[in-house]
């Protein structure tokens, strides 16, 4: 790296220059009393000091160590004239590495070597600009050299960009597993589950590992059009990955075949290459699905257990399971709508519907906070402010639901945005089965703010899902 000035490594002049500069950074923002009764005035020169630090790095003035960063597998070497004191303040590894030498050769993967200048810059001024492709190498460098603040910052960046739908979730998931970053791993897994349709249609789907695939197939909170879409996504993955038969058969057995209508099951058996190859491994599950669709749920429950995951719907976006609801200017006033869902996934109930009424209130107040204008003695009491309330969503059946014997309904509300014609889920709220609303629905949302993460062009995009959950009413006779 070119530089305009240079001091002898380890010189006392270099030491005192650096010590003075660090002192300036430490005391850049301070309070000063201007005398008399005047208020204290803030004197903040931190930006100027940061600029001087950047100049130190760029020009190499008063440097006392040299870092030679070689990209693995190449002859490319990048040279950085740096300052032992600043590197050691952030990294115990640098402190130990440079304690007895003024020059170090660092071997780094090519992607890490390419962003090493940004990494060093962060050690000097505490900021950097991150691109999606640079997140993993920067996080890897921060982890290797023990710069915990940068490690947390890059991980936060990755989680935030997952929520925005821009991040390569599959690659980041595998990276998180390899580094043991449980928080990032769980964030990636949640994003993939909530946006499986978009991921399965992208180039990332081919990079999914068998372990990640198995993690996804076990989840009931997958968001996708229907179970048939999941089967087709799995079949496409099998065609690309060509895993061992045991892996393929275990994955095929994770499909919830009772959630697929009989007509579509017949088509799968006739046309699916995966079933043609591994059909015997799932023959019992297909028979179970046909039996489930042929009998009434009450009759089926007399002989078979319906509490297994095979009979629990996932978060399906198909019209039979719910409806989208876009609320423009959601902070303005109360809104209501209604929609219908099928009574249950059984073919026996294919023509039976349940009507649901939905009420949205942007500023609902609990009874304890509702306005009271006077007490018994006529003394005026303060009214609660509208901003004291919170958004509320209530979903109730339009009738008593007498046809729903042996069934309870699990309600889920997805909050998200549409990008390129696909629903991108940012938040999901599940109702307790005995409740008509989600207690924490948009609890921290500011719907008054137009750039709120919950709004898209000042509209709240919801998708309401109702999942019937069967209960075993009569034990199977022995």
Curated annotation (Swiss-Prot):
Pfam family, one: BACK
Biological process, per Gene Ontology: negative regulation of viral genome replication; response to virus
Domain of life: Eukaryota
Taxon lineage: Eukaryota, Metazoa, Chordata, Craniata, Vertebrata
Chief site of localization: secreted
Gene name of the encoded protein: BTBD17
SUPFAM superfamilies per UniProt: POZ domain
Name of protein: BTB/POZ domain-containing protein 17
Gene3D superfamilies according to UniProt: 1.25.40.420, Potassium Channel Kv1.1, Chain A
UniProt xrefs under CDD domains: BACK_BTBD17, BTB_POZ_BTBD17
A GO CC annotation given for this chain: plasma membrane
Boundaries of every BACK domain copy: 169-269
Keywords, in A-Z order: Glycoprotein, Secreted, Signal
Position of the signal peptide: 1-28
Domain BTB: 63-132
Positions of glycan attachment: 61, 100, 195
Keyword Glycoprotein: yes
InterPro entries: BACK, BTB-POZ/Galectin-3-binding, BTB/POZ_dom, SKP1/BTB/POZ_sf, TRAF_BTBD17
């Amino acid at each position: 790296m070119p530089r305009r000035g240079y001091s002898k490594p380890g010189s006392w002049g270099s030491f005192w220059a650096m010590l003075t500069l660090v002192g300036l950074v430490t005391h850049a923002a301070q309070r000063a009393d201007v005398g008399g009764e005047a208020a204290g005035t803030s004197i903040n020169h931190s930006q100027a000091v940061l600029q001087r630090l950047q100049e130190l790095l760029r020009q190499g003035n008063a440097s006392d160590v040299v870092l030679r960063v070689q990209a693995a597998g190449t002859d490319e070497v990048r040279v950085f004239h740096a300052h032992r004191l600043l590197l050691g303040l952030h990294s115990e590894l640098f402190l130990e590495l440079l304690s007895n030498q003024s020059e170090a050769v660092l071997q780094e993967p090519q992607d890490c070597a390419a962003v090493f200048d940004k990494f060093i810059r962060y050690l000097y001024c505490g900021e950097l600009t991150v691109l999606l492709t640079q997140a993993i190498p920067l996080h890897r460098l921060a982890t290797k050299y023990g710069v915990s603040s940068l490690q947390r910052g890059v991980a936060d960046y990755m989680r935030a960009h997952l929520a925005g739908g821009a991040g390569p979730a599959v690659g980041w998931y595998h990276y998180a597993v390899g580094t043991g970053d449980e928080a990032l791993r769980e964030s990636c897994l949640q994003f993939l589950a909530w946006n499986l349709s978009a991921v399965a249609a992208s180039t990332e789907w081919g990079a999914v590992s068998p372990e990640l695939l198995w993690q996804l197939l076990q989840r009931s909170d997958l968001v996708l059009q229907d179970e048939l879409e999941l089967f087709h996504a799995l079949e496409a993955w099998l065609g690309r990955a060509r895993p061992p038969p045991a892996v393929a058969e275990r994955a095929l057995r994770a499909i919830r075949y009772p959630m697929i209508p009989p007509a579509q099951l017949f088509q799968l058996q006739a046309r699916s290459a995966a079933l043609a190859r591994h059909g015997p491994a799932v023959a019992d599950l297909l028979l179970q699905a046909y039996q489930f669709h042929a009998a009434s749920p009450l009759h089926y429950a007399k002989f078979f257990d319906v509490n297994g995951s095979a009979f629990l719907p996932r978060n399906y976006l198909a019209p039979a399971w719910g409806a989208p609801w876009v609320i423009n200017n959601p902070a303005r006033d109360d809104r209501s709508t209604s929609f219908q869902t099928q009574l249950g996934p059984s073919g026996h109930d294919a023509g039976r519907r349940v009507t649901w009424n939905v009420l949205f209130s942007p500023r609902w107040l609990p009874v304890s906070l509702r306005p009271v204008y006077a007490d018994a003695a006529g003394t005026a009491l303060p009214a609660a402010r509208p901003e004291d309330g919170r958004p509320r969503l209530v979903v109730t059946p339009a009738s008593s639901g007498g046809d729903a014997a042996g069934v309870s309904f699990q309600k889920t509300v997805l909050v998200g945005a549409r990008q390129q014609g696909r629903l991108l889920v940012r938040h999901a709220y599940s109702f307790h089965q005995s409740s008509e609303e989600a207690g924490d629905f948009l609890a921290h949302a500011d719907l008054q703010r137009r750039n709120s993460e919950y709004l898209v062009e000042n509209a709240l995009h919801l998708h309401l899902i109702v999942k019937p959950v069967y209960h075993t009413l009569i034990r199977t006779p022995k």
